[in-house]
Amino acid sequence: MKKHKKLLLLMTLILAFSSVLAACGADKNEGADNGGTDKPKEQVFRMNLASDPPTLDPGLAQDNTSNTVISSVFEGLVRKGADGTEEQGVAEKWDISEDGLKYVFTLRQDAKWSNGDPVTANDFEYAWKRVLDPNFTPASPYAYQLYYIKNAEAYNLGDIKDANEVGVKATDDYTLEVTLENPTPYFLSLMSFQTYFPVHSSVEGNASWATKPDTLIGNGPFKVSQMTKGQKIELVKNDQYWDKDSIKLEKVQMSIVNSSATELSSYRNDELDYAGHPTGNIPTDQLSAIKKELGDELMIKGISSTYFYIFNTTEEPFDNVNIRKAFSMAIDRKAIVEKITQGGQIPAFGFVPPGIKGESDEYRTEVPDTYFQENLEEAKKLLEQGMKEKGYTTLPEVTLIHNSDDNHKKIALAISDMWKNNLGVNVKVQNQEWGVFLKNRTDLNYQIARSGWGADYNDPMTYIDMWTSNGGNNDTGFKNEEYDKLVKDAYATSDNAKRMELMSKAEKILVQDNQVVMPIYYYSSVSLVKPWVKNLHLDYKGDIDFTRAYIE
């Protein structure tokens, strides 16, 4: 997701970025088809994870690392093709009512779980209602993604007690009927999102089912054969998968190493076939040498994702909006992308990134990200004003947390230096292991925290509805009735122009009026792939799909 070149290259990348995203994520697989090797290769794909996946339960996953594994071990009703369009998954066909409120999915009868059991419509109904169950512990961070379904929100919040009132029903073993609250143009694309994946009913009552290969029953192209915490995850081809003849890889080996330098070294030594985004990183200080040495294997691609910091709005000193605004105005985003990340990133002054569809063009083209400017003098005034409002003579001690990663650390240290030089504020930088970091964010046990967000589907709503008062991924404590109403109204209207207007008003409240988030840059994906790896794809939001890849 990270790195930036200089001005001439940036312009080139922006053009490439636009064409890639206009195609909704089609991937050229640069480097994978150039050249070759005389070295014989087994059908084994080797990559690295910078951390252990916090969970392999589709109902609980909320991060790229978890989803990379989950999306190869499970499959939804539809799957995303290489060009970003919906393809048949477990569903062999679907019908949508004229009013857009009812979806009827017909499941293929040859879909099986990895233990040989048939995958049925009941498995989907069970999985979705499991996520929505108000007693589901821990609560699913993505339960709100199912709120498009009739009565889903009311059931999840406890206003409706009977799960049978939720608009999802298996009418027979191979027919799933879904009724929505409102017409939702992107609902079909959500069927390839992990929270909508089926779960085998055997997980009931077994909280640790997703931590062991023998109880982790999936229905995707691969199954987990080995899991050793802090060391590796190994996947093997699932011989029960309905489309197994299209799967060429026999194994996927995932090392777990939290060092971008070690990851790069392993790649150079032919111990990895892939390195970098989305589950690892390429050291930014090595990019110049990599371009000379491994230029044909380097992929730099603009993606629809945003790198940002969040403020805990419930704790001092960031319960004051002027202090939040001062911190956001006092950093130099251009310096960060040109001197640190160096991989085609674009400074961000909004939350929704380029490449996301708007009314008739990209949303970001129709709604420019002019919500604030970098202004040191104004930042100093706002800090002084905020401190006066809080009764401070000295700002309380401030800590910025980030998950352990060399590149996140470089960015955090650079930004803390900017705050010191520009505002006279000392900020402690603290790195945390991924699982600990996520829990501290969720529990609001932080002051400022690193974050990143990629599209779950190609619509601005994927960046907007997460900040509602009950949003499962709203780790800021931000609650705003006007914001919540704008999101609900946007859900309810089928007028696309009106939807965009409502969402742009919500984004203004989030970024300009309240500065809940501090946008830093719009991501690019930087990765390396060996020339013998074929048919590997990164989609418009930067997710990797190796399920149909092969070694040649």
Regions found by a protein language model. Give the residues of each.
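A structural "hinge/loop" feature
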Residues: 49-68, 90, 117, 139-140, ...
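Alpha-helical secondary-structure segments
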Residues: 120-127, 173-179, 220-221, 249-251, ...
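Gly/Pro-rich hinge or "lid" segments in bacterial periplasmic/extracellular proteins
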Residues: 154, 173-174, 179-247, 251
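N-terminal lobe/hinge region of extracytoplasmic solute-binding protein
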Residues: 48-98, 217
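Detector for C-terminal structural segments
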Residues: 330-361, 407-416, 438-552
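Structural transition elements
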Residues: 347-386, 405-409
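Aromatic- and charge-enriched surface segment that lines or borders ligand/interaction sites
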Residues: 92-142, 317
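Ligand-site clamp/hinge motif
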Residues: 205-207, 240-286
